[in-house]
Amino acid sequence: MTLEQVIDAMVQAEEDGKKVVRLHTGDPCLYGAIREQMDELKKLEIPYEDCPGVSSFCGAAAALEAEYTLPGISQSVVITRMAGRTPVPEKESVRSFAAHQATMVLFLSTGLLKELSAELIEGGYSEDTPAAIVYKATWPEQKVLRCTVGTLEQTAREADVTKTALIVVGEVLDGTYERSKLYDPTFTTEFRQASCSKKELGQTGENQSTEMRQEAEGQSK
């Protein structure tokens, strides 16, 4: 359906006294083309409510058991796409964003993985930077394919994934990070005072490591 046909259908239902649900595929607020639909409804003075859902990039994080913003690794998330029939401004190219080394989530790019890898590498990511392809995040048929920037195209091809997938790129997928300040006993917040010094915390960590090592040695005897 075209925009005009969609609006005509909603107008007709409104005139018939029906409640209309415009159930949108994908993420309506990301590459969803809903602004033009809302503007048309406003012109026609038809009231509506925009009901948000869980974004697929959030669903992908859950599927990956990942946090996109890890201390010491990345505190920013870039949501973007490869240029297709809808162009992307040059200043917003994947290559430009890759230079920041932030976590990247790419929509609508599953059919361009060879080109995507080249753009990411040219922008500054190494070939062995952790990456993942999440097919139909949160759906029953969800697939999680872990790979690297250099093996994106091969991984998707071997799993026969050609569309309906998100690409996640960044060191946050590696598992190495710094402990957060939020739950750090040496850190004072609005709700609690620091309970120990960094030196004391270090000694506690060393003692725990020694106890774990001794326990492991005892079990091996």
Regions found by a protein language model. Name each.
Residues 27-31, 55-56, 111-113:
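Gly/Ser/Thr-rich loops at beta-strand to alpha-helix junctions
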Residues 61-65, 81-82, 119:
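Short secondary-structure transition/capping segments
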Residues 5, 16-20, 33, 76, ...:
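A contiguous loop/helix-start segment that scaffolds small-molecule binding in enzyme catalytic cores
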Residues 40-60, 71-80:
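Short, acidic/small-residue loops that bind anionic groups at enzyme active sites
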Residues 62-69, 91:
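Active-site-proximal loop->helix
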Residues 39-41, 66-71, 123, 149-151:
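Short, hinge-like loop/turn segments at secondary-structure boundaries
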Residues 1-51:
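Class I S-adenosyl-L-methionine
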